[in-house]
Amino acid sequence: MILTMLGVNGPYPSIKGACSGYLLTSDSGRTRILIDCGSGVLGRLLNECTVRDLSAVVLSHLHFDHMSDMLPMNYLLSAAGVECLKVICPKTPEKVRRILEDGALDLYPTQDMMIGEMKLEFLRVAHPVETYAVRVICDGKTFVYTGDTNECDALTLFAAGADLLLADAGLLRDDWTIKKPHMTSGMCARLARDAGVKMLVLTHINPSYNAEAVLDEAVNDFPEAMVARAGIRISI
């Protein structure tokens, strides 16, 4: 699989950046899944493929920094003559989900399923709204994305042995409390270590943070950690 980072910021984009958006492509190129579609992601997606090339969209949750570009996506689908695009997303918050119900977006509940060559599995995680981590198995490899979450014990088993873990490092240590909705990069590193993953990529980077500071809090527990950057591609 190939993971392309379209946007890596949250809860708002950096200058010339974009919020959460990740394109996962099978080795054959026949299956392409867009995971999250926050502000600024749609234009970057079109550098990689057309909307006709998408097999599905997975929205980890319905906060705007993870789904706001689905609104112009609907306009693009209409212009491209695409009648239906499968979108897997939570049922709540209902008032946000209703925004997605018009047009060509065909909404499916968040549940385990096959999309083309990819097997998708989900885990409810610790965030103020209904939010899911996603595990994707394809081409003999396993990719896990935590979605937005504070510490969640079940993630260790869910991510066990993953070839790549893409984890929410939305906070630095000094900004974290148990009531906050995100992990720190150090927490991500300990999760990766305990789960025995091969590669850790830190994402959902607050634009006010220095990437070096984010990485510094992770490398003691997982020396191979890296900070996500928009535009990079990683072979899994």
Language-model features, listed with the residues they occupy:
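Conserved beta-strand hairpin/beta-sheet module of binuclear metal-dependent hydrolase folds
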Residues: 1-47, 132-147, 164
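A short helix->loop->beta-strand "cap" motif at the edges of active sites that frequently abuts
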Residues: 31, 80-86, 195-199, 223
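Active-site neighborhood of phospho(di)ester-bond hydrolases with catalytic His/Asp-centered motifs
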Residues: 34-38, 55-65, 89-90, 143-149, ...
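Short beta->alpha connector loops
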Residues: 38-41, 92-94, 125-128, 149-152, ...
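Active-site metal-binding motif and surrounding structural segment of the metallo-beta-lactamase
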Residues: 40-86
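Metal-dependent catalytic neighborhoods of phosphoester/phosphodiester hydrolases
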Residues: 68-77, 98, 210-218
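Metallo-beta-lactamase
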Residues: 83-131, 138-139
